[in-house]
């Protein structure tokens, strides 16, 4: 479920039988929702999978503070990746994949890599740094600077 309203999702979950599982798809409020009992099924996790994995493992181990420290900063990053127009969120996911060395080029079918502006991508870079979501910071910086240079900046 993705209502993009944390309290509404909690209310719906509260009306379900205990045997039912509700997966949150709320890419804006997932930290509190997962902590409060929603299972996660999030597109945002594709953008920062190592952070998500470490945070969920911490939560499973009962270390709520570590969970919050790891996953908390990723909410702002997810909000930027999924900012309106939301249908272009894949550009942000592909961009982070490229920055992190998982793709050899920042290119998407149909030219969708150009669906987001450089300022939008720059904010993704800033938020990814703050969230410790750049797996290879030096590579990410080099690739970001190369993209800026190609665009005359």
What are these regions (language model features)?
Residues 1-87:
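Catalytic alpha/beta core domains of metabolic enzymes, predominantly
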